[in-house]
């Protein structure tokens, strides 16, 4: 990861105010990085704080999946996602998929304000970082070979 990180900012409706406050508090640090956000969250950050944000679709309309695709393509380095654990979301499966893809590609993820505070204040946030990446492609190839050779059934 370069010194300038590409940070995705997402918040469920009941957590948007929290994210807005957090971003406002960390404006100095965040302004040094490239910011991405899902639709409504991005609009709020632009309107209320005057931030330059690359806006994607709203979460329920595919924005979470767009962020996930960007993670898989190596175009997002950090995910800050203030989600609402008490409110069921129409796109809960997208949220789970997003967290899973962030884990597969080993990017830092904060889903609570405390974790976001620790993450943003890390010296690594403003420095070059060489992340360790598990090669899941190799594991997939191994599983495919076993299925083809009849050693185990596909799951």
Curated annotation (Swiss-Prot):
User: NCBIfam families under this entry?
Assistant: MGSA, PRK05234.1
Q: Which CDD domains match?
A: MGS
Q: Which gene encodes it?
A: mgsA
**Which residues does the record give as substrate binding sites?**
12, 16, 38-41, 58-59, 91
Superkingdom of source: Bacteria
A Gene Ontology biological process in which this protein takes part is: methylglyoxal biosynthetic process
Record keywords: Lyase
Q: Briefly, what is this protein's role?
A: Catalyzes the formation of methylglyoxal from dihydroxyacetone phosphate.
Q: Which family does it belong to?
A: Belongs to the methylglyoxal synthase family.
Q: Which residues form the active site?
A: 64
Species of origin = Thermotoga maritima (strain ATCC 43589 / DSM 3109 / JCM 10099 / NBRC 100826 / MSB8)
**Residues annotated as domain MGS-like:** 1-155
- Catalytic activity line of the entry: dihydroxyacetone phosphate = methylglyoxal + phosphate
Q: What is this protein called?
A: Methylglyoxal synthase
Q: Which PANTHER family match?
A: METHYLGLYOXAL SYNTHASE
| EC primary class | lyase
Gene Ontology terms for molecular function = methylglyoxal synthase activity
Query: EC number(s) on record?
Result: 4.2.3.3
Q: Would you tell me the Gene Ontology cellular component terms?
A: cytosol
Tell me the HAMAP family matching this sequence.
Methylglyoxal_synth
Alphabetized InterPro entries for the sequence: Methylgl_synth (IPR004363), Methylglyoxal_synth_AS (IPR018148), MGS-like_dom (IPR011607), MGS-like_dom_sf (IPR036914)
């Amino acid at each position: 990861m370069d010194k300038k990180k590409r940070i995705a900012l997402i918040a469920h409706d009941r957590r948007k105010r929290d994210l807005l406050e957090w971003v406002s508090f960390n404006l100095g640090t965040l302004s040094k990085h490239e910011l991405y956000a899902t639709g409504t969250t991005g609009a709020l950050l632009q309107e209320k704080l005057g931030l330059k944000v690359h806006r994607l679709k709203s979460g329920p309309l595919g924005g979470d999946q767009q962020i996930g695709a960007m993670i898989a393509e190596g175009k997002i380095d950090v995910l800050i996602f203030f989600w609402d654990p008490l409110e069921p979301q129409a796109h809960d499966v997208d949220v789970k998929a997003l967290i899973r893809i962030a884990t597969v590609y080993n990017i830092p993820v904060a889903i609570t304000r405390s974790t976001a505070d620790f993450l943003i204040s890390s010296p690594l946030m403003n420095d070059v970082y060489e992340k360790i990446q598990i090669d899941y492609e190799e594991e997939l190839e191994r599983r495919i070979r076993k299925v083809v050779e009849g050693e185990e059934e596909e799951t």
